[in-house]
Amino acid sequence: LWFRERVRQEKIPNVWFSARDGYLPKKLYQMLDEKPTVYFMTSRIAAVEAGMEDEADIAYVDSMKFSGTLEENLRVRFGLRPDRIQVSEKDGQGLARYREAILSNAEIQRERYRAYIESLQVKDGAVAFFDFVAKGTTQMYIQKLLPNPLKGLYFLRLEPEFMSDKRVSVEAFYGTDETQGSA
């Protein structure tokens, strides 16, 4: 009900429910409102891969918590195929050595994502972007792929301070102050 009311109050013409977390909320929303909605096929990794444009993006992604080797990091978070990875601990360059490969892969993913988004026939105006529990990383990188502004409407937003300088518009139903003392 909260989500539907926010969409109505802000007169948002496009409503997207992010994949997995948005499946059931989309079904419930459609029981209340006949307005067309989109089950938006995404994941944080897919959005990040497509949205990276420069070294600052690479550094931001690298700053996120990850417990794995450099090779796993390159494969899992930056989308590099194993045949493009030749890790040498001796050169000490880490991710810098793979900058061009990361950005080249991002360009390919970006074009694919833009084709997918174009197929959705997005109307002029904002997009309400539902995610259940998130920081806003997926939304930030998806925002780079379309001209419409995204308004994140989350059930719970994690670590809002982590995204405070990223100009991501998010409103949460359940605030982090309300999570203090919860299980």
Regions found by a protein language model. Give the residues of each.
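Long, low-complexity, Lys/Arg-enriched
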Residues: L1-A183
